[in-house]
Amino acid sequence: MRAVRCHRFAANSGSSKQISPIREVLCLEDLPLPTLHAEENDKNKVLISTHYAGIQYPDFLQAQGLYQIKPNLPYIPGMDVAGIVIDKGSDVNELSIGEQVYANTALCPDGGGGTGGLAEVVSVSANAVFPIPNNLHLSSVANIGRNYCAAYHSLKVIGNVGPNDLVLVTGASGGVGMATVELAKAMGAKVIAGVSTLNKGSLPLTAGADKVLAYGRDRKVHKQFKLDVKAACKELGHPQGASLIVDVIHGDLFQDALVSSIQPLGKICLVGFVAGQKPIKPGLLLIKEASIVGSLWGRWARENPVEFRNNMNEIFGYMKEGKIKPRADTIFSLDNYIKAFELFENNSGKGNTVISMNASQHSKL
């Protein structure tokens, strides 16, 4: 089978100052086809023929060696898999061969850093596999884990968001940001979507955002963004600020605009730090009695499998009802996988990026 592999990290010794081009560290290889045996370890496993694999910014960061979780080298990137069950262990009763499914490699017992998805055939634990409703196309669910699971965990498990809440989302034109906007609206909340530039504003508007505001890339624009958020909060009936902030950007924006935008006793949920890590000043947070909470859903999901499966069922329920509409915004063939990673290298990724794994069934781009 063919699979994408990373043999070394792009960042030298984890330094963001010396980074090789991403195409120098990833390669498409022929690897042995995984199989299931009668051994105890394989009784609860499933083999999936991968039709689509999701790629998002964390996958790019991971290949650079700059993500929170570093896999052992060499490794196959990709956490999200959508495909067809082609074999299963003797203890797997809830799935059928030929069934279309979504699988999340981060749910396997060792977690694996959420890797292994960019392969034509994937072997995963049955607890990491979820049947896909028949009305959903495989390509549309190939980013559920990186995007919708991260968003749901931030909104519901951490934020307990409901109909009376106001959510501020940064990076709202990206995969996690778009999913956060959609899910927050499905939960009945109002949403302010923050984007780097207004030319990225159409996607969160389509997802249902009540307001779209630009925070730019410099501190002058950050200050204007803070004023714009304050005005938007008042307009949306929350003069004291947002109930929850879901932040994937961090950097200077966090201190310049986000801390002042949270309501007293509110929560700021840190999902990522695309703009880098900056010191946090505690003064205003103390006065507001506001909380900063990290959001990394994989460990929680492995430790709370029943609750997580219920959460997944709720996400799929929103999909069936049309309250959220997962989609593949950009699709590349496996032969052109590097272009997907270069979208994030060039800071031009928008929405959901997907690799079509089966060249015989899916046209190349």
Question: Model-derived features: where do they sit?
Answer:
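C-terminal capping/lid region of NAD(P)-dependent oxidoreductase domains
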Residues: 1, 316, 323-330, 338-365
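Adenosine-nucleotide cofactor-binding segment
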Residues: 185-253, 307-308
